[in-house]
């Protein structure tokens, strides 16, 4: 009986202790918060996840982040970059996939590393043998310090952009691009042989990428047949004519677009057609 009472008391104490530990488990904010950013590029996207340390009065590069040593490019877990499609990064072809992103800073340049082991805590288990790629870029010095490490995409076009990192007074800039033209052209050839033809989308791609403008004009006019008084189609028809060098045709088309927009009380496309008309007059 005494033994039973002893075990019961022990179990009660254990449960009480575990309950106490459970009550003490609280969630607090991270010193270095995590950010995930996604950027569309071409037909795919780039996803970047990293933790953002702050200066907090410390000397960063050359001390907190030693020169000449592999750095996780942030805090906590190593930075992860994921490409849904093949890209070119600073002239290097990168297959679609997920990579751990590290860097080795010096006063004048950075060694950027893409490692095949994407999920690591810091750089403690980093192995150079797992590197997919290393390349160097110049250090970009800034006169004004930035408290929180920040990475972002800038100067983004349909198929190219820049990935920039900045912290304290230092940083770097990477050029990234993707080649989608062959895919899009093959897709256009395929779908234009079907019953439901996306005339406008095909015309828009030809216009934006300097393809056969006569074909683009033919397609936009075919698309326009479904809505012959559309100021939307008129502005694009006029833009194509203007790019072909047909200023007189562009002016006449844009003026039609202005007329239809006014009839429909569409101030946005009235303004857009007027803008093309003004260019055609110049």
Region locations from a protein language model:
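Short, hydrophobic/aromatic-rich beta-strand segments within well-structured domains
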Residues: 1, 100-102
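Short N-terminal segments immediately surrounding and downstream of signal-peptide cleavage
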Residues: 24-42
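Extended, well-structured beta-strand/loop surface patches
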Residues: 45-96, 103-195, 228
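A short structural micro-motif
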Residues: 105-106, 243, 260, 279
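Alpha-helical adaptor scaffolds
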Residues: 185-241, 245-252, 256-260, 266-267
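TPR/TPR-like alpha-solenoid helical repeat scaffolds
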Residues: 239-243, 265-282
């Amino acid at each position: 009986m005494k033994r039973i009472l002893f075990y019961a008391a022990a179990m009660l104490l254990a449960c009480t202790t575990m309950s106490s530990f459970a009550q003490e488990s609280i969630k607090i904010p991270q010193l270095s918060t995590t950010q995930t950013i996604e950027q569309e590029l071409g037909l795919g996207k780039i996803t970047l996840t990293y933790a953002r340390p702050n200066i907090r009065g410390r000397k960063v590069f050359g001390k907190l982040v030693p020169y000449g040593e592999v750095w996780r490019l942030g805090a906590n877990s190593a930075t992860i970059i994921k490409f849904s499609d093949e890209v070119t990064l600073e002239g290097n072809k990168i297959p679609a996939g997920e990579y751990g992103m590290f860097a080795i800073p010096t006063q004048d340049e950075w060694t950027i590393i893409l490692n095949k082991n994407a999920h690591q805590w810091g750089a403690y288990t980093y192995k150079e043998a797992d590197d997919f790629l290393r390349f160097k870029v110049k250090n970009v010095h800034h006169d004004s310090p930035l408290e929180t490490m920040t990475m972002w995409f800038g100067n983004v076009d349909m198929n190219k952009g820049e990935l920039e990192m900045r912290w304290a007074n230092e940083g770097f800039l990477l050029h990234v691009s993707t080649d989608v033209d062959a895919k899009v052209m093959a897709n256009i050839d395929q779908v234009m042989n079907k019953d439901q033809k996306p005339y406008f989308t095909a015309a828009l791609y030809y216009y934006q990428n300097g393809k056969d403008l006569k074909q683009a004009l033919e397609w936009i006019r075919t698309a326009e047949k479904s809505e012959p008084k559309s100021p939307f189609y008129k502005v694009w028809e006029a833009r194509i004519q203007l790019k072909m060098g047909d200023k007189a045709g562009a002016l006449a088309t844009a003026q039609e677009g202005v007329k239809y927009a006014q009839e429909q009380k569409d101030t946005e496309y009235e303004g857009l057609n007027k803008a093309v008309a003004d260019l055609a007059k110049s």
